[in-house]
């Protein structure tokens, strides 16, 4: 939900949850940044401390994947935290102040997955609420928004973005970025199509944090996300991994999706398995139960394949309006 803070940082209190409200009284909470996990010495290394462990669960999330695209990391905002959302808000606010109706500021969102769609929607709503001179464009290298999903859902999301006056460019990859523009396509002697921007946001993929690159457990060679079995155990029996820091095996060459819904489900079993490991009991396996997808696009939302307790899968495959907005909340 951090994307909502792009439009209005004042909603932070509805997005951030104080640790004291969720931890048990017996849980010690330490604030610090993990720099490494030494699996041989069984130590979690922090910037200014070190914590010994018997078992450790790695749930540190993911970073933004820039895929080696020249200039992209240096010039684009990312959206992984409240600080990122604040920075995007400040960027579009400043760009709008320096623009005019005749010469609107250009905002480009790279990537039309979940984060990209929701980001573009929030910026479009900001534009409309503040009557701001902003043009919003979303760029996706594959052929449709929300790649790899049901075409009916893709169509509904496209229509909602278009209703918000978001320009959609698909089938063209960003190949380069500098301080003024992104370049689409191109080659060795072809710089590609130039798109000027005032604010650039990149949401085009995830990767494992640098801090886990050197951890001595099996990882995906490209993304450095940690390989974990369906019980969350890694190649080191004392190291578990969960959430989008991990590639959790789901059988038939599938892994759990890097979504909040999956992480929420997984956390219960992962936590129980830590206790089981300590007690020497067999570990439970977990399989993601997809309860459907709800994507917010500005003030509206689009739902797909929703399953409700006691009801099962709803007979309507894709829907929006008040019902979808209620589910999103």
Q: What is the predicted function of each stretch?
A:
Residues 29-32, 36, 128-225:
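A Rossmann-like FAD-binding core segment of flavoenzymes
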Residues 27-105, 110, 201:
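FAD-binding core/adjacent interface of flavoenzyme oxidoreductases
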